[in-house]
Amino acid sequence: MNRNVIRLITRGCLILAAILLTGVATSCAHRLYARMQPDGWSAQPIVNACRFTQDADLDSATGTPVGDEGYYLYILTEAAKWDFSDAKSILISIWMHPYGHSWIILESPDDRMEFGQTGNIGKKKPRYHEGAMKRLDDEHPNPIAYLWETMPDGKLQIGKPDRPPTFVWRMPITRLKYQLIYEHVMNRKYDEFDLRTNNCTDMAAEVAALASVNLIHRIRLTLPPETEVWFLRQRIWKDTKYRILEFSTPEVLEVDLRQLAQFGIGSDYTEWYLTLTR
């Protein structure tokens, strides 16, 4: 199968993934998309233009990733079930389930290592949802601006986190890609955690890109200037630079990984992992 045919197949997969992410064909994905509403709210997953990078190691017949025997990359997600259907729903769902997580496993014939990016633990600064809610209470003109803050408490997670994933995806990689990813993980800076540009899902997506797969993992929110919070009308922003918020989230990443597994790009290893950790 030549590269043009593979490109057409992967482009079709991306289009189908975009349809599924906007809620036409899955029961859970509708929470990730909301068309522009009268109050100014909208939510839209950000879809990549190309699924594989130029140096991807693909099977010539199927167009799916291949690797060396015993070398694998796993991406794990813990989706917090955030509801992006409207401004009120997202605020309530974040308050009820403020944390999600994404992390990785690197496997070779001799070893299996688990890594992730952590932060936003609330010791040096209030956590994102706490800081934003505090600014709402204080009638700050731009309470949502707290989500633009950088947390100084980031660190490298080594080993299993203290909560199980909701999905585990595995893909084969070459020994060369394994070494490239390992060096990236070991040399990456973790001391800062940023919701918009440097969170746990960003780290997982970076690693996937080194394995030559571009994952759909970001969402774009258009925020209304005001919304109802706890039965009170509250200002969200006054300065228009806070109208658009883009960030990576396990919810979007997990939907994409599930679709990839259905397309035959990688595999669902959730049960394997949960059995392994019992």
Model segments located where?
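Bacterial N-terminal signal peptides that target proteins for export
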Residues: 2-14
